[in-house]
Amino acid sequence: MAETALHTPGKNYTFGTVLTAMVTPFKENGEVDYESAAKLATKLVDDGCDGLVVTGTTGETSTLTDEENLGMFKAVKDAVGDRCKVIAGTGTNDTAHSIQLSKRAAEIGVDGLLIVTPYYNKPSQAGIQAHFEAIASATELPVMLYDIPGRAGIAIAPETIIALSKHPKIVALKDAKADYQSTTTVLANTDLDVYSGDDGLTLPLMAAGAVGVVSVTAHVAAAKYRILVDAMLAGDLATARAAHFELDPIQRAVMSHVQGAVAAKHILNWQGVLPNTVVRLPLVAPSETELETIRTDLREGGWEI
């Protein structure tokens, strides 16, 4: 059984412990708003994030060109420098394309790569393993696997993750499949830094040995996640539980009613952080009923909206 990193005093995690999966701001004309992205990244670090995932699912990566992806990586890295880790979402369902984008991201100076399960193709586990290993071998950057079967259409089997953990560049897992037994198996048999990819499961996954969270809700509640994660790493369950329950209505507001990027952009706009709420098709704006439900949850969480 591998030793988990939980409660290790002074442990320096490769990607940090409170990471935001950043939205990609757009201008009213639909172009990427790199200036707003830089300002948002700076705010998130000021609020307590020590890692930022750029152009992942929440960053609407499937609607971005390669040049827009690279522009986002550069804008965020230039804004935050060494204050936090910048992880570039360079995974696609085309291995060769993923390698090309990863190499270009490395040239920009990002700190790591987030590689999602190859979606739509539905490869075998052998194909999934070969895909990840090829990308991880293409640069010197550390890699975080991203297991999200609800979007990819296929899960990474625990046995495949265990095999992948032996690759020297594969050091972390963003676990977004809500399969506690699978996560437990991975934690018990690897030295990967595991991150909750489901905001509401941060506490229970950390109780099993995960080291933090890659969160959408942290756009608007990073300081509270910092309290929760630091408390869990310190073994202070009472403080962590209190933060967990305080976060619950905020998590519902961001994640339960409309797509996370859509909700996050509206809340950030209400806060004055983003100048607009523009998303790219096929995402669309919420209905007024959905917006009011989001506001109701935020009020329950103590917000004045």
Language-model features, listed with the residues they occupy:
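C-terminal alpha-helical cap/extension of soluble enzyme domains
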Residues: 3-10, 14-24, 43, 47-49, ...
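Active-site beta->alpha loop and helix N-cap motifs at the rims of alpha/beta catalytic domains
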Residues: 3-20, 24-153, 161-163
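Solvent-exposed, flexible loop/coil residues
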Residues: 27-30, 36, 68, 123-124, ...
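Gly/Ser/Thr-rich helix-start
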Residues: 31, 57-60, 90-92, 198, ...
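A general structural signal for well-ordered alpha-helical segments in protein cores
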Residues: 37, 69, 73, 98, ...
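Short helix-capping segments at alpha-helix termini
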Residues: 78-84, 107-109, 139-141, 166-169, ...
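Catalytic alpha/beta core domains of metabolic enzymes, predominantly
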Residues: 134-138, 149-248, 252-256
